[in-house]
Amino acid sequence: MLSEADRKNCADILMHAQKERKQAVQLSTTFPGIAIEDSYAISTEVANRKIAAGAKLIGHKVGLTSKAMQRSSMIDEPDFGFILDDQMIADGAKVKHADYCKPRVEVELAFVMGKRLMGPGVGLTDVLRATEYVVPAIEIVDARLQDQRKIFDTVADNGAAAGIALGGRPVGPLDIDLRWVGGIMYRNSEIEETGLAAGVLGHPALGVAWLANKLGNMGTALEPGHLVLAGSFSRVVFAQKGDTLHADFGALGGIAIQFV
């Protein structure tokens, strides 16, 4: 475990890396005693600093939702990060590549909460009843720490959350079987990745349930209007300057952004 001073130093490192768009040395290397509790405390510290500076908390993201990713990270559960309003990107937007260190994109579904949801004891049905609608999303992920990261680094770095674009057609959570929502990620008109939403813990709503229970253990709830990225169901696609990324969700429409 780290001291409070070391946790604040870690937050300083992450914020400096984001400001300078230059990856820092892994926190797990600089602070070998770091524990997962430290990592969540660090990500919370960074989020609180940004909120104090004027940003607004609008939701959360869930990561590491596939068994393969959990095994590679040597954990047995997902992780989460905070979504702030300054991370939102319009569908069709031109995004400055220079604003990121090494941006990548993922295909996801976003749940917008209609009712307050707080764990423990939240299950799939609870999530579906509390959700106002579900909408396609592209998440931009951007690690502020160098490669060979450990789970402690990923969690402290807010799950690499960097940007979110919503688009396509919103649907009610009970209108379709969300497991069968498919996503195709194109880069410059070529298919790079495909996936099914069932890849998120068997059902994307289970990613939201896990989050509600995790936050409930911390004394926090998902509030009405909050956005939850339930977890990626594709592998990441690296984005270079000049690339156009288009996520096709079939009957639910699509989203596109361009890095300039």
Label the model's feature ranges.
Residues 233-237, 251-254:
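Short, charged beta-turn/beta-strand-edge "cap" motif at the junction between a beta-strand
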Residues 2-203, 240, 244, 254-260:
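Catalytic-core "active-site belt" of small-molecule-metabolizing enzymes
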Residues 231-232, 249, 259:
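Active-site proximal loops enriched in glycine and acidic residues that flank catalytic Cys/His/Asp
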Residues 208-236:
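A conserved acidic, glycine/proline-rich C-terminal tail/linker
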Residues 192, 218, 249-250:
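Hydrophobic/basic alpha-helical segments enriched in Actinobacteria
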